[in-house]
C-alpha cells in the first residue's frame, strides 16, 4: 500500500533556525501515528510540513500523492491541522466558526449538527464568541470544525490539552471513529499513556529527525 504521507530527508527552517534536519517518515492510510520526543525535537515542525504550512528547504515529501514542494496549496485543502492556536476566528461565535469551515466543503446541516453534538456543543455554547471560551471549549470548537471539513488526514498537536477527563475520552472516541471512516491521524502529545493506547504506531522525533 502506498503511503499517504511520505517525507524523505526533509530539511526545514524556522527563520534562521533549523526545524527539521533530514526527517524521514512514512504513514499508511488508516494509521494513528504518535510522534513522541522532547520539547523542540521537531514534532510540531513535522505536522506543519505535512500540512503544507512549513516549506521544505531540501529533500522531498508527498501527502495523498501531492508534492509538498510544488503543490502546498492543494495539500492544505485536503488535510486538517489542529495546532496550539486552534485555527479559530475569535470575533465569531462557536457556531459561526463551525459553519464557516463547513461552507468550505459544502457540508450538510446533518454533518454540522453531528459535529457539534460529538463535541458537546449545545445551543448555549454555540452562541458564545470564541474569544470568551475556556481553553477546553476552544479545543472542542476546533475539533468540531475539523470534523465538518472532512479532512482525509488529521494532524493534531497536543489534541488532549485543555480537555477534562470526559472530553479526552470523547476525543479518543471521535478519533477512532474518524479512522474507521477512512481518515489517517498523526498526533503529537504529552499525554503519553493515553496517546500510546490510542496509537497504532509510535515514532520518536529528536534533533529534527525521526528515529
Language-model region placement:
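Conserved ABC ATPase "signature" region
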Residues: 99, 109-125
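The feature captures the beta-strand-to-loop junction immediately N-terminal to the Walker
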Residues: 36-38
Amino acid at each position: 500500500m502506498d503511503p499517504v504521507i511520505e517525507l524523505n530527508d526533509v530539511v526545514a527552517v524556522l527563520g534562521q533556525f533549523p526545524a527539521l534536519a533530514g526527517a524521514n517518515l512514512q504513514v499508511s492510510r488508516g494509521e494513528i501515528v504518535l510522534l513522541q520526543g522532547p520539547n523542540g525535537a521537531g514534532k510540531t515542525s513535522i505536522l506543519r510540513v505535512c500540512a503544507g504550512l512549513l516549506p521544505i528547504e531540501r529533500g522531498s515529501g508527498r501527502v495523498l500523492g501531492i508534492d509538498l514542494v510544488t503543490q502546498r496549496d492543494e495539500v492544505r485543502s485536503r488535510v486538517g491541522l489542529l495546532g496550539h492556536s486552534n485555527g479559530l476566528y475569535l470575533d465569531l461565535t462557536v457556531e459561526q466558526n463551525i459553519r464557516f469551515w463547513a461552507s468550505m466543503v459544502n457540508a450538510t446541516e446533518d454533518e454540522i449538527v453531528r459535529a457539534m453534538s460529538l463535541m458537546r456543543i449545545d445551543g448555549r455554547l454555540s452562541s458564545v464568541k470564541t474569544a470568551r471560551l475556556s481553553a477546553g471549549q476552544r479545543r472542542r470548537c476546533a475539533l468540531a470544525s475539523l470534523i465538518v471539513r472532512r479532512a482525509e488526514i488529521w494532524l493534531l498537536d497536543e489534541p488532549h490539552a485543555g480537555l477534562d477527563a470526559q472530553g479526552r475520552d470523547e476525543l479518543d472516541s471521535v478519533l477512532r471513529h474518524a479512522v474507521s471512516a477512512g481518515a489517517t491521524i498523526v498526533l503529537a502529545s504529552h499525554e503519553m499513556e493515553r496517546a500510546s493506547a490510542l496509537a497504532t504506531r509510535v515514532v520518536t522525533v529528536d534533533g529534527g529527525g525521526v528515529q
